Amino acid sequence: MSLDTTEKQQLINTHQTHGTDTGSAEVQVAMLSERINRLSRHLQNNIHDFSSRQGLLKMIGRRKRLLSYMRSKSEQRYADTIAKLGIRG
C-alpha cells in the first residue's frame, strides 16, 4: 500500500509548485490520493481487513483537511488540484 521512491518522486515532479517543492499541500494531497486509491483496491479484495479500513478513513480525513486548507488559501490552486487528480466529481 505504500509508495516506492520512484512513484513518490514521479508524483512530486507532477504536482510540485517549484523546483525544490516536496511538501506543499498539492504534493501531499496527490500522495494521499494515490495511497487512498491503492488501499481502496486492497479493501475490495480483503473485505474483513478492518485495521486497513480505519487507516483509509484517517487518510481520507487528512486529505479532506488539506483540501479545506487549500480552498481557504487559494480557490484557484484548489480547483487545479481537484481537476488534475480527478477527485470530487
Swiss-Prot record:
Region Disordered, as annotated, extends over: 1-25
Q: Which residues form the signal peptide?
A: none
Q: Where is the composition biased (Polar residues)?
A: 8-25
Gene3D superfamilies listed in its UniProt record:
6.10.250.3130, S15/NS1, RNA-binding
SMART domains, A to Z: Ribosomal_S15
Say if the entry is tagged with keyword rRNA-binding. Answer: yes
Q: Which GO terms describe its biological process?
A: translation
Q: Which InterPro entries match?
A: Ribosomal_uS15, Ribosomal_uS15_bac-type, uS15_NS1_RNA-bd_sf
Q: GO molecular function, one example?
A: rRNA binding
User: Listed GO cellular component terms?
Assistant: cytosolic small ribosomal subunit
Query: What are the entry keywords?
Result: Ribonucleoprotein, Ribosomal protein, RNA-binding, rRNA-binding
- Does this entry carry the keyword rRNA-binding? yes
Q: What family is it from? A: Belongs to the universal ribosomal protein uS15 family.
> Its function?
One of the primary rRNA binding proteins, it binds directly to 16S rRNA where it helps nucleate assembly of the platform of the 30S subunit by binding and bridging several RNA helices of the 16S rRNA. Forms an intersubunit bridge (bridge B4) with the 23S rRNA of the 50S subunit in the ribosome.
What is the protein named?
Answer: Small ribosomal subunit protein uS15
Q: What is the species listed in this Swiss-Prot or TrEMBL entry?
A: Synechococcus sp. (strain CC9605)
